[in-house]
Curated annotation (Swiss-Prot):
Single GO term (MF): small ribosomal subunit rRNA binding
Protein function: Binds directly to 16S ribosomal RNA.
Pfam families, A to Z: Ribosomal_S20p
Protein name as annotated: Small ribosomal subunit protein bS20
InterPro entries documented for this protein: Ribosomal_bS20, Ribosomal_bS20_sf
Family: Belongs to the bacterial ribosomal protein bS20 family.
């Protein structure tokens, strides 16, 4: 256990950030999963709607620093490509 006041504060801050990031990552995965499920079901309209809902969530996670900007860009690109296969 930490003895310094600053170390104790850091532990509290890290726990708070961990919980916040965990929630954002979980939400992010859910939105991505919805897009993939709609594509698997070959439901083009639902897939497009899910993609339009997922893109802001992915971008926001990147801007908050939860995921890297390149990771966000890659996710958006791959999901868009996947949805476009439905025509």
């Amino acid at each position: 256990m930490a003895h310094h006041k600053s170390a104790l504060k850091r532990i509290k801050q890290n726990k708070k950030k961990y919980l916040r990031n965990k929630h954002i990552r979980s939400t992010l995965r859910t939105f991505i999963k919805r897009v993939r499920e709609a594509v698997e079901a070959k439901n083009a309209d639902q897939a497009r709607q899910a993609l339009l809902a997922a893109i802001p969530v992915i971008d926001k996670a990147a801007s908050k620093g939860v995921i890297h900007a390149s990771n966000a860009s890659r996710n958006v690109s791959r999901l868009t490509k996947l949805v476009n296969t439905l025509g």
